[in-house]
């Protein structure tokens, strides 16, 4: 068996984070697999230092619109297969997926849509949730071990945000969004952090304009989910709230497989 350390981080712009100690942080943290969301760049816009990092192979999923969305994986072990979507153009065109198949599991790195902008984006978000769930449940039902990480853009329970009552009618904490997470977990997936820590005030995103991070007025909207089949393999799940550079902090899991 080997120990694998996975980290996920919405970096809110990979070129911006590169100027804020990103390479030093990777060297120090030394994940086996690093998943990034909201990279906001096409690969052709990146310096070689961001494409080729030491012992990692990198894979980038780009939105058709420049400077928007985007996901990336840096991995020490080369995957058997990489996909950049679930076969639905309306979702795949926004660069929201990097799906890496390894011998022991399939890893989904996803930047889920934000539904705050307008009603049609909320509808898009909910349709995205359902399409993704159908896709991943089908794989799980075929006996695949699944790891899912990324910015889900929804806080699941009241414990997952500092101010639940004032936000009960805000996208990101709407009943229909929260109910989707209920359904998703009921379909055979686990919120890994809550296996190890049921304390309040554990957040992964803070509003930058109001300097909410200084007061820890945040939301937990970034997750590592696993299929039930991997429950016994997870040895740790955590957040890294002291890592700066984005409006999100990184999250991690360790798995023995």
What are these regions (language model features)?
Residues 1-53, 63-69, 156:
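N-terminal, active-site-proximal structural segment of metallo-dependent hydrolase catalytic domains
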Residues 3-12, 104-116, 149:
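Active-site-proximal beta-strand elements of phosphoester/diester hydrolases
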Residues 10, 26-44, 107, 136-158, ...:
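Active-site beta-strand/loop signature of hydrolases that rely on acidic residues for catalysis
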Residues 33, 54-57, 130-217, 221:
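Metal-dependent phosphoesterases centered on the DNase I-like endonuclease/exonuclease/phosphatase
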Residues 40-42, 47-115:
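Structured beta-strand-rich core segments of catalytic domains in phosphoester-bond hydrolases
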Residues 66-81, 211-232:
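Conserved beta strand-loop-helix elements of the APE1-like EEP
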Residues 76, 100-103, 227-228, 253-257:
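Active-site beta-strand termini and strand-to-loop segments that position acidic
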Residues 87-88, 113-129, 166-169:
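Surface-exposed cleft-lining segments at the edges of enzyme active sites
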